[in-house]
Each structure stands twice: as structure tokens, then as C-alpha cells.
Amino acid sequence: VSFDKITVKDIVEDCGVNRNTFYYHYSDIYALLDEILENETRRVLTENLTESSWRDAILESCSFALKNKKGIYHIYNSLSRRKIDAYLYQVMGRIMYDFVKMQAEGLSVKDEDLHLIADFYKCAFVGLILQWLDSGMKQDPEYIVDKIFSYLEGSTRNMLENAAERNDRK
């Protein structure tokens, strides 16, 4: 069932509350969805990201999807899919920017370059996560994340050094 087919009636019956209670808190089911995704985004991003915790933050997003697999697919297969995409881009953007900035320590890299490199990684990871969702979340996200970051080891610093070197030449 697509999220678009779920009604307020379905939600209140499933939760054992009345319609007035639902409408007291939310204008519609999309407002409820927005609040759920905003709360999850806030929860993941309020963690102080360190070199080891960025990996955990990515896995936390995947874990949220696995724990809420049925609901995620209802949303993913609906007109509200863009909300999932926006959530992923927002979370991954912050994680990758913080990671890239940490890797740039000691280098004279322009903020514009930091953002571009972070966006590169953000798009790569969101693409992998969307592919994982498309495939039914069958692969272990920890395996995928660990493998990707082992491939990337040193490449982020190399990209940043190249950016700093180009900045120094100008």
C-alpha cells in the first residue's frame, strides 16, 4: 500500500485515538510524516560527529529504515518519495560536510571546495542508499558502508590536498 492510500481513519484506528486528537496535533498525514522525518533528522544530526561517529550516523539512518521498513516503502512508493530523498540528502550532506571539514584540518581549502567535495560524497552515498532501498534492503548496510569507506581511505585527504594546492597556485 502506498502512503498516498493511507487515511487519517487508518492511522487513528491503528493507534486507538480519535480523529480530533490526530487533528489537534497534525493538519494531515503529510504533517505527521514531516514531523517524523524532522525528528529523525534532528536526532541523527545532533550527535557530535567525530571521525568514528560519521560512520555510525550513516548506519543509524539505515537502521531507522530497516526498523521502519514497511512504512519506509509505503512512503518510498508514493508521491511522498521526495520526502525520503530530502531526508537522505539533508542528513548525508551534514555528515559528509563535517567529515570533509575534519579531513581538511591543516590545509588551506576554500569553503566552496569543502562543499563541492562533501556534495560529491553526499550524492554517492544517497545514490547507494536509494539503490539499497530499490533492492529491498537486502544487503547488510554495515558491510556496504565499511567496504565503501575502506575503498575511500585516503582519497578524501588527497582530494583536499589537490584543492589546497590549486588554491595556493592562484
What are these regions (language model features)?
Residues 2-5, 138:
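Residue at a beta-strand N-cap/secondary-structure junction
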Residues 35-37, 62-89, 96-103, 130:
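Amphipathic alpha-helical segments used for helix-helix packing
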Residues 1-3, 50, 155, 159:
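Basic, amphipathic alpha-helical hairpins
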Residues 81-106, 112-127, 157:
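Amphipathic alpha-helical packing segments from all-alpha helical-bundle domains
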Residues 4-8, 13-16, 23-50, 55, ...:
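An amphipathic alpha-helix adjacent to DNA-recognition modules
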Residues 1, 108-109:
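Cytosolic nucleotide-binding catalytic cores of signal-transduction proteins
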